[in-house]
Amino acid sequence: MKYEKERREILSAALDMLQYSLISLSGGNIALRTDEGSFLITPSAMRYETMLPEDVVLLDAEGRVLEGCRRPSSDTKALLYLFRQRSEINALIHTHQPYATAVGLVEDELPGCLVTVLDACGPCVPVAPFTISSDEGMGVLAAEYAGESLAVILRSHGVITMGRNLSEALEAAIYLEEAARTYLAARALEIGRAHV
């Protein structure tokens, strides 16, 4: 099996995503560009707690399976599109994290309200319009709206974070959720104060 170390890193990141409540059950996915230009991606509809290194699927740049017996994530086309658009990015994480997703329902961007999100994602995290996830369209909108940011919120869907490596993409997702929770709390206090 090729890339066993990288596959184990993906599984570890997925368990961290569960620990930080960024995903539930089999939702979301992780994709990693290899040093040979192929891609590792988590399988579709499989719970992360039961996933083994061999369950992570190895794909070529066109999305063809090179190694693995599982079906790759339904978001594969979108994620491969993002990799093509952002050559400096080697890791993508897609989550359904609740607070950042909530921001995407009511705002067009999450301002850089905490230093951690500023460092991990950029000055703001834009919100892309809703689109179905099973085609390249989600990747097209995510790339367009993200610009140079290392994260984008997908309206009514979730989040995609990016990094030069898996650690950066994971930190972006965690700090984004922290900032979204803080931002929504501040907005609630502001609204509450207006009604006193």
Where are these regions (language model features)?
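Glycine-rich flexible loops
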Residues: 1-193
